[in-house]
Amino acid sequence: MKRILLFHFFIFTFLHLLAQRSVENLNFQWQFAYDSLFTNAKTIDVPHDFQIEQPWVAPSADEKADNTDVAANIKSRLSARGFKEMGTGWYRKTITHTPTSNTRYLLDFEGIMLTGDVYLNGKHIGGTDYGYVGFEIDVTNLLRKGENILVVKASTQNEKASRWYTGGGLFRNVSLVSTPADIYFERHPLYITTRDNRYVTVSADYTNRTRMKQTRMKVSIYDAEGNLVAETTALRGRNPQSRTVNIKAQELEIANPKLWNLDTPYLYTCVAQLLKEDGSVADEYSEHFGIRTIEYGPDFGFKLNGKKVLLKGYANHHTLGALGAAAYPRAIEKRIQLMKQFGMNHIRTSHNPYSRQFIELCDKNGILVVDELYDKWTRQHTGSRVPFMNHFASDITEWVTRDRNSPSVGLWSLGNELQQDPNQPFNDFGVTCYKMMRPVLQRYDSTRLVTVAMHPRYRNWETDSLPCDLAMQTDIQAYNYRYMYFPGDGRRFPWMTFYQSEASTAAMGPNWFEMNLDKVIGLAYWGAIDYLGESQGWPAKGWAQGVFDISLNPKPKAYFMKSFFSDEPLVRLSVMEDKNAGVEWNGIITGTDRQSELWNRPEGSKANLVIYTNCDEVELLLNGKILGRRENPKDAKSRNKITWNGIDYKKGKIEAVGYRQGKAVARHALETTGKAVKIVAEADNSQWHADGQDLQHIRLRAVDSKGRTVLTCQDELTFTVDGDARLVAVTNGDINSHELNVTNQRQLWQGQAMVILRAGLAPSKITLTTDSKTFKTVTTKLETK
């Protein structure tokens, strides 16, 4: 693998030496303050979320729920926004510029949360009204020779500008791009399409201001090993009406193509070069892509490369737990890889475009994405600064051209739950808006279908006689939660193809097994990972109904999901602590039963057990004594879940053994633990890069003399970091905790805590020292390379 990466590095280094395009990383050494005078400014690096650092704001005694928008789930003023105060952050950076002749310069922002304004040398030069999409500003004639002062103002807007915690600031990459001034590729210029799993067509948007009578574009396709597998050159004559045009290369055939799929997500690289008259490279742009075929239909749901695939996934907001909105690639990949371990193959980007790195990591790891642009189509829910109708076209253009070449993107979603909003620009449940937006999308990509996630699926809350008008317009019928209408709607409208775009974790199991899995596309579990914002009420800082806590620790119910998302034999044992009656939210019942894996209980007490399994039957043993064997229920409401009530507690070990065809294939046990005797540290990143952005997640556990996690230990830990790295977040998974995430201490919760370190720019020996009042100091030796 190292040889392959080096080969790619040398190929593209050589090509870039020939070309004039360059990208300068501007992520480092910004000054940040909460006012434009930069009072008490501090040095930060991008990505950065200024809101995550702020204190929690508890609701005052007189704050009441706001039910004017049932979907907003507003329990108090800041409950939807994660109990963080709204505000503005100011960023300042000095850019030293040495002008080069015939060169064009662009500032490239991948996003500013939630809205942003950009100033160069005191002059307002641009910004964004919807910070989830990127933008660029041509600064060719604005940059001075020598020092230039770049200032960015980022605003969270008011608390009603979003239904969830957004974070605030420069939460994605910033760069300075330079290209030739007279002939160059435009922003996100390449459009790469494939046919019949072997043919590739490449077109590109470019500008030519030279006197050349023809423009030549050379297209080269490389496989993942760096071998050239196809090449062609396209020609286009001058266009007197427009200097910015599109050039399309002839279709290329790839011999013995390797397909992109979920298990082997093979990626090719397309390198496009605009050539000068002497054959040298004027500008160059490269992008990864995959060769694959996607199909949708009412009789089979979804096919990838001709084979039926069920989407098994989740839908969450863009934030990353204790890191807030800051889009760290390592944190994103950690999530993706964990979800794959639990049988997932799909993520819906609710309800906005995630970072470009997220999409690229889904390409790399074999995840299918429903790529979503908006929540509701109103000013309030799309930045709140300007009318929605003023910016949707530019948002769509940026979003689609950025992601259209990624094989992981299988479906476009233009919005979410919009038809219930009374403030729509047109009073027809979104149909007019959709009909205006869809042609803009298809102008830039016609290879994928388009949907909108609908809830309720009907015209209003009072009737469910027919699907809403918008469901008659979309290519795919995406219903949030209302999977029970798939059969009836399918009979009345046999052309419909169904996707459960949000599924409740409270109804987990039945909302999978009760669907006709032969015909549906699949589902995405809403809030499968706990997140900040959309709190059901203080002290919870956010959504707590996930099957993974906010630090990514799996809850027992995560294994229930895995039992039907994966074929791997599984049995998982937990204790039902109490049953959550659930609460109504957004027209559905939500909530999760409180379960634990604690087997330290009062003598003489009784325990009710839940066993999740995909085995035929399960045997239960207490200290080696067989308590019985039970079959896996076959009905949809109880399948893969066995309850065992009234077990007399005895200290020791209780174990569940799963059987298939009479053979033991899986087992899981809970044990009575002893007193915690030490803290152990486990780092997750063996290839920690000194790139200024890579992360190291270190999980700390309190263990007994046998190395078992002591779930009842709640000691406070204090952390010190030495070397070229710094602590950027701490967490323990407790959504109710009042502790801050950006600090150097954390109390254990369920015997665990996690520290997240950010690498510096120089390779370094790193030491994390963990102290507490109870345990010996733990020294963790790490290294960045």
Residue ranges and their predicted role:
Residues K145, D205-G297, W644, K650-K651, ...:
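Extended acidic/polar, glycine-enriched regions
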Residues K213-K218, N261-Y268, K606-N608, T613-D616, ...:
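Short flexible loop/turn segments that cap and initiate beta-strands
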Residues V139, I247-W260, I642-Y649, N741-L761:
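Short, hydrophobic beta-strand segments
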Residues Q20-D108, S162-L170, L573-G582, D593, ...:
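Extended carbohydrate-recognition surfaces in non-catalytic/accessory domains of CAZymes
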Residues E24-T39, M86, E159-K160, I183, ...:
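Substrate-binding clefts and catalytic carboxylate motifs of secreted carbohydrate-active enzymes
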Residues E24, F28, A33-D35, R81, ...:
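Accessory beta-strand-rich segments of carbohydrate-active enzymes
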Residues M1-R21:
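Bacterial Sec-dependent N-terminal signal peptides
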